[in-house]
Amino acid sequence: MESPEWIVLDIDGVLIGIESSYDLAVKRTVEKLWTKLGHDGSISLETIRDFRKKGQFGDDYRVTEGLTLAGLNEDLKKFVEEFPRGEKLECIINRTGERVGKEKVKPIFDRIYLGKKDSPSEYGLWRQEKPLVDTSLLDKVAEQFKLGYITGRSRQELRLASKVLNHELSDAVTREDFLKPDPRALTHLVGESSGIYAGDTHNDGLLVENYNEETEGTFDFVMIDPDNPINQVLRDLLDKK
């Protein structure tokens, strides 16, 4: 792609490190649900990250429910290792014949991640998030391209991300709009255009694949990981402009 019109970025794991926030909120929620269901166990942060990267979940409520169900019925580490890339929560529900339900996951997860004024200090994990991106690069990208964001966060959580970065994240699609990998998330933001989408999971790649198949637009996907960090990707884009 010679000159993309849009640069679209995921937020969690790309712009913001979530190891001590979302990852930990999933862990604590899964373990609390297991206790309520009479199961004694623990889950590693590595297992959570591997599971999220492989599956087609859209938000961490679904990640949490999937891990809760899997751990009740199977060896969790083996389950995640063998989990088919791109599969959904429904695959686990069908396999186990059970479900937990968002209505049981969300109150626990939100209290841990968002916190409450009357909560113990362990809650409000969003405060532990750290920027991964040099926000001056976002400003430079916005001068050269159209810049937007697609995230599994809610609008409330998006505002918290802006606080963490001390940078306004405008032109954003949140989970109230569409869940990835629904291509309408990208269409809603860019229409049918050319661009680059940077994310850190297989689900992000599926979003781009679905968009290219179902619209006249053309997007390339860039996987962000420790060997290909977002700051380097943005610098390379600016150098090529």
List where the protein language model places each region.
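Active-site neighborhood of HAD-like aspartate-dependent phosphohydrolases
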Residues: 1-49, 62-65
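A metal-dependent, Asp-based hydrolase signature
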Residues: 52-146
